Amino acid sequence: XXHGEVEVSAXGKNLSPXV
């Protein structure tokens, strides 16, 4: 997590579109 990112416990990170 960071700015424009969503940390998922699934295994990694998913970048939020746009945000």
Swiss-Prot record:
Where does it primarily localize? mitochondrion
Q: Write the record's keywords in alphabetical order, separated by commas.
A: Membrane, Mitochondrion, Mitochondrion inner membrane, Oxidoreductase
Question: Which terms does the record give in the GO molecular function aspect?
Answer: oxidoreductase activity
Q: What does the record list as GO biological process? A: oxidative phosphorylation
Bilayer topology term: Single-pass membrane protein
Its GO CC terms are: mitochondrial inner membrane
Q: Where in the cell is it found?
A: Mitochondrion inner membrane
Report the family membership. Belongs to the cytochrome c oxidase IV family.
Q: How does it assemble?
A: Component of the cytochrome c oxidase (complex IV, CIV), a multisubunit enzyme composed of 14 subunits. The complex is composed of a catalytic core of 3 subunits MT-CO1, MT-CO2 and MT-CO3, encoded in the mitochondrial DNA, and 11 supernumerary subunits COX4I, COX5A, COX5B, COX6A, COX6B, COX6C, COX7A, COX7B, COX7C, COX8 and NDUFA4, which are encoded in the nuclear genome.
- Role description: Component of the cytochrome c oxidase, the last enzyme in the mitochondrial electron transport chain which drives oxidative phosphorylation. The respiratory chain contains 3 multisubunit complexes succinate dehydrogenase (complex II, CII), ubiquinol-cytochrome c oxidoreductase (cytochrome b-c1 complex, complex III, CIII) and cytochrome c oxidase (complex IV, CIV), that cooperate to transfer electrons derived from NADH and succinate to molecular oxygen, creating an electrochemical gradient over the inner membrane that drives transmembrane transport and the ATP synthase.
This protein is called Cytochrome c oxidase polypeptide 4, mitochondrial
In its UniProt entry, the species of origin is given as Oncorhynchus mykiss
What is the organism lineage in this UniProt record? Eukaryota, Metazoa, Chordata, Craniata, Vertebrata
